[in-house]
Each structure stands twice: as C-alpha cells, then as structure tokens.
Amino acid sequence: DMNEMRYSKLLVSIGKNLVENKRADNHFAAEVMERGGKLVNISPEYGPSSSKADYWLTIRPNTDTALLLGISKIIIDNNWHDEKFLKEFSDFPLLLRKDTLKRLKPEDLNKEYKNQLSKDGPSYTIHGLKKKQYDKIGDFTVFDKKSNSVKPLTRDDVGDLLEKKKIDPQLDWEGTISGADGNDIEVCTLFWAYKYVHLKDYDLDTVVDITHSNKELIQQLAKDLATIKPATIHIGEGLNHWF
C-alpha cells in the first residue's frame, strides 16, 4: 500500500522517478522528508528524484538484481537480518531436498501423513484457498530446534500461529534425515541454500564490477536497510522494463 510509505524512516526508490513521472504518489516521499526520514534513489541517471535524495546510487542498466543480491549478502554475512521475522513470516526455514531442489514434504518422511490445514484458518476463510489448490501445495517441513527433529507445518503456521505450535524453526541448517523408504535424504533450509549457494557469487567487489555502483554507498545502503526501521523499498516499472 503506497499509503504506508509516509510512515517510513527510510525510503529506497529503485527504477522510479517519483518527482517527474509518479506525481500522484510523490507526496508520500515528501512526507518522509518532512518527518526527517532518509531518501535513497537508485537509478542510472542523475535526475530530479536523485537531487532530492540523501544519496544517489548510480547503477548500470539491468543490473538491479545483482545489486540487491549483493546487499542481501552484506546483511546476512554481518548477521544484520531479523531472524525472528524470517522464521515467522518467510519461507527461509522450510526444508529443501538437495537431490531434487524441491521442498521436503511430510510425505517424504511418512507415507501415511495427512495434510493438516484447518478449514477454519485464514487460508480458507480469508485468502479464499480452494481444496484443489491445497491438494497441490500440501504442507511443508522445518527442522525444530526444540525437539531436534523435523516437524510439519501448514501455510497458516506463521506469526502467532507458529508460536502457538511451540516450534522453533532452525534458520541456518543442513543435514541428513531418513526418508519413508529408509534411504537417507540430504536436506537444507532455503536460508542455507540462499546464504551458501546463491549469494556466494555476489561478494562486494563482484557486485561493483557488475553494477558499476559505488562500493561505499552499497555498504551504506546495506547498513541503512538493516538498521533504519521501518523501511520501504519502492520498485518501479519492473526494473528491466525499459532496458
């Protein structure tokens, strides 16, 4: 919701010229300024929005993804990420099979497992989930720190609903477990795969080489995103829409 931008203490605009071509929404950025918030503009050219920002991060066209992956690596490598939020509101704790790179399903461990999503939960009553969709999605698995074992989760088990189950998902984990057929399955959390596999190619020097962005400002933005809360990232026109 664009309305939420006005409450941000940090507003990062990527690929969007709020001043010139988003005049219906640029007052939100002005309100951030009035409240003493910080503005950051990421764009190839220095334009009106850049002139209003606290700092402008220039970037080579079509390299925004590399920049954001590099920033993610800095945040994770410095343990600046919000572990509690990632556990409760993201898919990072969910387990993946290393052999197929697909999610580890409860049925992989117990062939008699039955899906546990309640028809009275938010998926059905609020989100409008259909049984046909749920049959395709199924349930998920995490490695629980408390019991030191794999536990099933439904798509409703987030936030307070996860805490009520008294499950503490391990975020950064890999291991070997026994499957329903008795064979060992090598698994890892999505966070583990993201941190040690996907992000390993996006060290700071490599990102600078790809994006032509300023090294110090990349580090500054990573620190700002990790420490200034609440923050908003406003992405415009799909980033690669024009290039």
Feature names for model-found ranges:
Residues N17-A29:
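Glycine/threonine-rich flexible loop motifs
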Residues Q219-F243:
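Acidic catalytic cores of enzymes that act on phosphate-bearing nucleotides/polynucleotides
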Residues S13-V19, L204:
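The substrate-binding groove and active-site-proximal loops of carbohydrate-active enzymes
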Residues S50-S51, Y55-T227:
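Long, well-ordered, tryptophan-enriched scaffold segments
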Residues E31-L39:
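A short helix->loop->beta-strand "cap" motif at the edges of active sites that frequently abuts
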Residues D1-L11:
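Glycine-rich oxoanion-binding loops at beta->alpha junctions
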Residues I42-P48:
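Short, polar loop motifs at secondary-structure junctions
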